[in-house]
Amino acid sequence: MLGSPKLTARQQQILDLIQNAITLTGSPPTRAEIATELGFRSANAAEEHLQALARKGAIELVSGTSRGIRLKSEALRSINESRSKQFPLSLPGLSQLMLPLIGRVAAGSPILAQEHIDQTYYVESSLFQRKPDYLLKVRGMSMRDAGIMDGDLLAVQSTRDAKNGQIVVARLGDEVTVKRFRRTKDLIELCPENPDYQIIVVEPGEPFEIEGLAVGLIRNTMLM
């Protein structure tokens, strides 16, 4: 795609809303959430704008999931370039990050151990507002309704802390999983975004730690 897509003010507003949601929560908003945020009468109005954005090449819509919205890399670059003209000190220029791609994680060893690194990718930093530390290849469809599909590359920022509702990379015993984090008074729940999968309940005393937060999503084909 040559140049930036010509968007209406409303389309740009929705595109910004999608990017902010992905940055803050690790997943795009639903149609209903977009409608509520922007004062639309129904989710159908949001869907019409999303279809227009998809036709202009700014996003990709994934069928069969309420959060099936993916930003195209070109759209992200155009957003950051336009904002940098207004706020030149608040956003970095286009530069590349060198991110290790983590494959399967062996039990008991650090997630960034050398033996877990399949390869290294150079990725434009403009794809993220929060700097990731590594990419994790998604396995399975447990987060399908958050727009995270099998084979996607999840950009992860290393941290031990998470807020309710954020998508995390968590280690539970010998397993590493990607789920939505929820803490209640007595326990922790790791929630899938697919009704075919069950919530993982972390009981007190069970070996558990957060490895990182999802800060972005990249389709594997974008890095070819």
UniProtKB/Swiss-Prot annotation:
Species of origin: Albidiferax ferrireducens (strain ATCC BAA-621 / DSM 15236 / T118)
Check the record and name the HAMAP family matching this protein: LexA (MF_00015)
The name under which this protein is listed is LexA repressor
Q: List the catalytic activities from the record.
A: Hydrolysis of Ala-|-Gly bond in repressor LexA
E.C. number = 3.4.21.88
Stated family: Belongs to the peptidase S24 family.
Please explain the role this protein plays, according to its UniProt record: Represses a number of genes involved in the response to DNA damage (SOS response), including recA and lexA. In the presence of single-stranded DNA, RecA interacts with LexA causing an autocatalytic cleavage which disrupts the DNA-binding part of LexA, leading to derepression of the SOS regulon and eventually DNA repair.
Primary enzyme class: hydrolase
Its subunit composition reads: Homodimer.
The organism that produces this protein has a lineage beginning with: Bacteria, Pseudomonadati, Pseudomonadota, Betaproteobacteria, Burkholderiales
Please give the InterPro entries that the UniProt record associates with this protein: LexA, LexA-like, LexA/Signal_pep-like_sf, LexA_DNA-bd_dom, LexA_repressor, Peptidase_S24_LexA, Peptidase_S24_S26A/B/C, WH-like_DNA-bd_sf
Q: Where is the active site?
A: 142 (for autocatalytic cleavage activity), 179 (for autocatalytic cleavage activity)
In terms of NCBIfam families, this protein maps to: lexA
